[in-house]
Amino acid sequence: MARLFRPLVLLCGACVLAGGLLSWQVAYGSRPRQVDLGFWFEPVTFSSLRLGGPLHASELALIQTLAEREIAQAFAGMRIRVSARRDTRYRIRVVQDVKDARFQRPVHVAGQSRGMTGFGGEGVVSFEFAASSAVVYASAGMVRGQIVEAIGRGVGRSAVHEFTHQLLPRAPIHASRDRSSYEYYSAARVEQYFGELRWDLAKPLLQARLAAAPVGD
């Protein structure tokens, strides 16, 4: 009898352990996870007669800070964390210039991305495009500092647009006709650099997938 009892105890103990692990997985493993977005600058430069010369190192640092702030503000309230990590599933680099690979002739664009549902995505944003556009759309009375800030906003907003393509690769976000939206198809507009932007048709799609868990959950 003792020989039969001992294996029975071991079997029951294994069942209890397996049940405990399953309960832990249900309680914790099924919780929505944070989505990491990698965002960083490669070496970039810009010079303009309107600015009176090239951008200084301190101005480039400010532009990066403002761009990161734009991304964080756009995705506030969602399970998204922005960092300079380069090993994230979703990532964007700011580079000097971006040419549209669909054309044989050089066509400069604000950015481009590729993404696949469930796998992530990667993309680039053109610093030259954002900086040049900020200069073009700046009103006559604006000073250098205001234009530098506009460059930061433009870079960040282009990154938000490209991240949206990666996060929602099948969503027709370019269908938006709201010029003050993140989804608008063109960065060649004054709203990209001056004033506030808002979400349009992508917002409910992003919230359905990335809404933050309730406080205390």
Residue ranges: model-predicted function:
Residues 1-14:
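N-terminal Sec-pathway targeting helices
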Residues 26-67:
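Fold-level signature of zinc-dependent metallopeptidase catalytic domains
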Residues 41-43, 86, 187:
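A mature extracytoplasmic/lumenal domain signature
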Residues 47-61, 139-144, 193-205:
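Short, polar loop/linker segments at the starts of domains and inter-domain junctions
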Residues 147-217:
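The catalytic-center signature of Zn2+-dependent metalloproteases
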